[in-house]
A protein has these predicted regions:
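Conserved catalytic core of the tyrosine transesterase superfamily
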Residues: 1-260
Length: 260
């Protein structure tokens, strides 16, 4: 590795850029820089290689949200095996994301105390905004949670709704939700290009927008801090926006050069 040259790094970054979006490439380059600095201190690569890498420029909201057509979301959920413990757990998790736009971290942190069954309320602790949100508990979600808990009630001292299904039993991590989603996509045979459950969150936002839900309401549900974060979904609903646009009257020439 002592013969490593800047051109070798450039080849690696170029190849990585073919499979990664610019945001992911930026993270990859940051990790690579750290590795090169460490190896240079250890004398295993020439010093200064970490400074030879250009970081791709990112623009806020430049990428389109990763949304699926709503019928595909429904079909994906239907493909789960509801006869198995894991199938019931995963169905409840992904239904929560598709219904409320939860993040994976918010799903795994749900506890039995967050569900007010009699009041019909679900309490969400939004990490990103450090706020709590109370949403109506839909019948479909309540049924899914009930079936999951009847089959897999969390043992003491756990209060989390979703736990590991294989030993050792413990809390579920957000990465496990991603892995479960990837497994679901593979078994569903659906053509879904996205690798994480976050696409269900984006799909809900676009579905609500196309259904006429105000942008402010969508932002509140998703836990966005600013309206700008929610407005990015407008780019996926341009066809619907054209349908409600107002016609611009054409100007008429009166013959004397004056337009009324």
């Amino acid at each position: 590795m002592k013969t490593l040259q800047p051109k070798d790094i450039e080849v690696f970054v170029t190849q990585a850029g073919k499979r990664l979006c610019r945001g992911s490439l930026q993270h990859e380059i940051a990790a690579l820089r750290g590795l090169l600095r460490f190896l240079a201190l250890d004398g295993r690569v020439p010093p200064g290689l970490d400074k030879q890498i250009d970081t791709p420029r990112l623009y806020r909201l430049e990428q389109l949200p990763r949304a699926l057509p709503w019928p595909m979301v429904t079909e994906l959920l239907k493909s789960l095996d509801l006869k198995s413990d894991i199938g019931l757990r995963d169905y409840a998790m992904f239904l929560l994301i598709a219904t409320y736009g939860l993040r994976a971290s918010e799903v795994v942190e749900l506890t039995l105390d967050d569900v007010a069954w009699r009041k019909g309320v679900l309490r969400i602790h939004q990490r990103k905004t450090a706020s709590a949100l109370e949403l109506p508990l839909t019948n479909e979600v309540a049924t899914a949670l009930t079936k999951h808990l009847k089959r897999s009630s969390p043992p003491a001292p756990y209060r989390r709704i979703f736990l590991r299904k294989r030993a050792p039993i413990g809390v579920l991590k957000p990465t496990a939700v991603t892995e479960a989603f990837q497994s679901l996509v593979r078994h569903s045979k659906l053509s879904i290009p996205f690798e994480g459950p976050h696409c269900l969150r984006h799909s809900l936002a676009v579905h609500l927008l196309k259904s006429g839900t105000p942008l402010k309401t969508i932002g509140d549900i998703l836990g966005h801090r600013t309206a700008e974060s929610t407005s990015m979904y407008l780019r996926l609903a341009t066809g619907d926006l054209r349908g409600v646009s107002l016609a611009v009257p054409r100007s008429r020439n009166t013959g004397n050069g004056v337009r009324p």
